[in-house]
Amino acid sequence: MKYSLFTVSVPEMTLEEAAKKMQEYGYDGVDWRVTDIPTDPEILKEAPSYWKNNYCTVDINKVEEQAEEIKALSDKYGLEINALATYLDCSMDPEKIESCMRAAKKMGCSRIRVNALKYDVARNYTEIFAEAVAGFKKVEELAKKTGIKADFEMHMGTITASASAARKLASYFDPKYIGVIYDTGNVIYEGFEEYKMALEILGPYLDLVHIKNAQWVKKEVDGKEKYV
């Protein structure tokens, strides 16, 4: 088993600071966070945060041109690039998805994250599911073309919150090209199935496991006790 750190978790560190710390703690690899870098001056004034002003982020618009630089940085600290963790989903611009795959190939990285679609109460699940299948058919073709696998994450609020739902979608595709990220924290919020059973359900589609802390906490909300 190998351990990798997803850099969303260290928003206060630069790429090099994080890589150095990972080496110190004995990590095998790194999942680089890849998305748009904020340009809003107000956001840039904010303290580092997971989702907004995250210093440990690779700009998705420059990821191809910076691929060799990022690989050199990872190599410097003895880190395998385990994944490029994008926030793209299967319905988004295929060129942007392919660009990230090309960047991954240059880095010697075998996979990128491309997520499934969010559930929308204003739409029918069957319609969203069909759209996701159509989207991942295009993603699978890009994976075959580039040799880079695309994984989608089990995530609350999406149509793949549980292992069963994730397997249903993944089963339309070759596990060589489309895989699933089992997220132990996300299933606490939504989609929990007994751990061993969940892994058995995912079978050959299970590609990565995210480990993080999550729990329900009782709080008083509007004068009532609720779990949040």
PLM feature segments, named:
Residues 19, 138-228:
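Acidic/histidine-rich catalytic cores of soluble enzymes
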